[in-house]
């Protein structure tokens, strides 16, 4: 039985659909140039594939209609696994990994699809605070390398890592820099937070 969706869920879905290419947009970015890390469901967490198979599948967007993975795709998958320090997990079954390891695998998969933009939907849901902080540090390093990171999150800690914030609720919205957000009345929703400098 489908659950009712609040206005926040509707806003989130529209944003993700727009950015991930399900709705047409005209900024010159192609849908295959966006790496997407969806919010995981119980079924996805129990996916019976190896880490290698999951990461390698991220290269499909750029491989056209080739029926097999070539050297280029395999090299890219290896590079992204090294970048996220998951090469030792290559032969392990995805469903046997911890939540943090699964998110690293999915991020490596998303990065195989793009070097421009990654879109993440609630990527730290269910992760413990230490793993969450490590995941945010990985995202910061990717952003420092020039990859645009767009993240939908209810996690307050994510504000510390943001450069710009789009805040939506049923009555109001805000878009601006982190500094502008922290100086606005919207920041009161979050209470006192650290890392409010740009």
Map each language-model feature to its residues.
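Single conserved hydrophobic/aromatic residue that forms the stacking wall/gate
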Residues: 1-11
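Conserved ABC ATPase "signature" region
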Residues: 71-89
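Conserved ABC ATPase signature
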Residues: 93-97, 101
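Catalytic Walker B motif of ABC-type/P-loop ATPase nucleotide-binding domains
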Residues: 118-122
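Helix N-cap at the start of a conserved alpha-helix in ABC-type nucleotide-binding domains
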Residues: 129-131
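H-loop/switch region of ABC-family ATPase nucleotide-binding domains
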Residues: 153-154
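H-loop (His-switch) and adjacent beta-strand-loop-beta switch element
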Residues: 162-177
